[in-house]
Amino acid sequence: MKKKILLLSLLFQSLMYSQQDAWIYLTDKENVAASISNPITILTQKAIDRKNAQGIAIDVRDVPVTESYITQLKAQTGITVLAKSKWFNAVHVRGSEVDINALSVLSFVDYIDFADKSLNTGRPSVQQSKFD
């Protein structure tokens, strides 16, 4: 009897805490041209000086992720925003598989990439580089 209770509790616990991690890739960024033409609004002077010293141009990767997109993701039921990447224009989230998949209907979501690769369905087979 003890073994059955232990087995059931372990099964229930794994179902209860089945949180998934995923990167939500976004379609675009707001005010890209304005941000690039006035880089001090998105980068510190020290960062601008470092890029200039290395001969690295300021581009779309330096523009932050659109804050209204992050706010909308945070407002979704069962979703916790853990991190954001301006280089990839993506947000790292945690939630149930169902809650994360529900984000795909948002107009600004390009695709979803689960940490558990077996959950990745519907992702385009060929991705265009965001840096071209």
Regions found by a protein language model. Name each.
Residues 128-132:
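Short, intrinsically disordered, charge-balanced linker/junction segments flanking boundaries
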Residues 19-127:
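Inhibitory N-terminal propeptides of secreted protease zymogens
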